[in-house]
Amino acid sequence: MTDTMPTPRTPASAWREMVRGNARFVAGEPSHPRQDVERRESLGTGQAPHAALFGCSDSRLAAEIIFDKGLGDLFVVRNAGQVISDSVIGSLEYAVAVLQVPLIVVLGHDECGAVRAAIDSQQPDATPLPPHIATLIAPIIPAVTRVADEHDGHADAQEVGREHLRDTVAELLESSELISDAVAAGSLAIVGANYRLVEGTAVPDVVLGAV
């Protein structure tokens, strides 16, 4: 029988469930909730996800596994490097305005290939990237530049990743009046977190709203 946990409807309760699920995953004791036939049937006519998650496309960043969630629990948007675009903003606005999620998690991670590509692209002897990849990673370059300027030209990948995560959250707020208004009204929170591949932990770095 499917787990019938009530859908979290406040930012704090939604984040609390994300933290609990991640703790189960880290401990190696996932409950794999809401993944049975009954759950599939109940979702046939609609969805009421607990949260939206915008993360990197990296194959090691499987959101429902990391947070021990089930079918219909998360509205997930992903691209390489978790880079803001019109399609990302539109998808997240849909989650907030139509699905009424109380929480957006922006999830970066260590050892990110997009971050590494952005760093390497700034080297004097860098091989030009294919045009679509170059366009994709362009929003990461400001974080590379800032970190390099602060560390005598050396851009540490983990620090660049953290800076880019903060940039992503800031750009989301600046680009979407709908989302920024929801945060200001208290109906939505945004948590920017970094996922540690080996440990399995999702560590908050940026928190906007009451969680």
PLM features per residue range, with description:
Residues 50, 54-91:
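Active-site cofactor/substrate anionic-group-binding motifs, chiefly glycine-
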